[in-house]
Swiss-Prot record:
This is Ras-related protein RABA3. Coiled coil: none annotated. It is found in: Endosome membrane; Golgi apparatus, trans-Golgi network membrane. GO terms for biological process: cell wall biogenesis; protein transport. One of its GO terms (cellular component) is endosome membrane. It comes from Arabidopsis thaliana (Mouse-ear cress).
């Protein structure tokens, strides 16, 4: 009597791919993005984390974050990018928002002078609440509108950044221009500063600098590679 067997033969089974385990995240970098309302902070996050731009984006309410995973010397690093509302009524979340941040982007709109004039206040608040070693980058968004609509000359921003010892970049969340470069530069500098501090403490016989309990390896710019985005692309408009 013939019997029907369910499943596949052992010969066929050996060709079936087994489910892969999720890759282990080695490090987590918290980066905060601050600036006036409507300068494009949320759009910068969407462009960097999902390569998206939402035309009907609404103002952020409270605090939210998005992530993107990158590879540094074979280690997986999750960049956790925090976004907050620029309105004054949400400033009560300040302390918790800045806690643990290794880097920050202070964003202004190059077509709105007032948003740039407020940058000094944002930097002051950041330095009052964040760690002294946090890496800060001044970011002029909406560079795609520079012809005919620019209200903040690049020279003004460069001068302010130099005076305040900030990194500087002009980007376009709409076109994606220079967005990845700005974030990667910030993340590389975070690594550099943490490593330098760690080595200095070790040479003095002190405790090592730790990031989420993990060892930090020295990297060069060529070691920074983008990995596949681990999260599903979704517009958070």
């Amino acid at each position: 009597m013939n019997e029907e067997m369910s499943g596949e033969s052992p010969e066929n089974n050996k060709h079936v791919k087994k489910p892969t385990m999720p890759e282990k995240i080695d490090y987590v970098f918290k980066v905060v993005v601050i600036g006036d309302s409507a300068v494009g902070k949320t759009q910068l996050l969407s462009r960097f984390t999902h390569n998206e731009f939402c035309y009907d984006s609404k103002s952020t309410i409270g605090v939210e974050f998005q992530t993107r995973t990158i590879t540094l010397r074979g280690k997986l690093v999750k960049a956790q990018i925090w976004d907050t509302a620029g309105q004054e009524r949400y400033r009560a979340v300040t302390s918790a928002y800045y806690r643990g941040a290794l880097g920050a982007m202070v964003v202004y709109d190059i077509t709105k002078r007032l948003s740039f004039d407020h940058v000094a206040r944002w930097v002051e608040e950041l330095r009052a609440h964040a760690d002294d070693s946090a890496v800060i980058m001044l970011v002029g968004n909406k560079a795609d509108l520079s012809v005919g609509k620019r209200a903040v000359p690049t020279e003004d921003a460069v001068e302010f950044a130099e005076t305040q010892r900030l990194f500087f970049s002009e980007v376009s969340a709409l076109s994606g221009g220079n967005v990845d470069e700005a974030f990667f530069r910030l993340l590389e500098e975070i690594f550099s500063r943490v490593v330098v501090s760690r080595k200095a403490m070790e040479s003095d016989g002190g405790a090592t600098v730790k990031l989420d309990g993990s060892r930090i390896d020295v990297i060069s710019g060529s070691d920074l590679e983008t990995s596949n985005i681990k999260e599903q692309a979704s517009c958070s408009c």
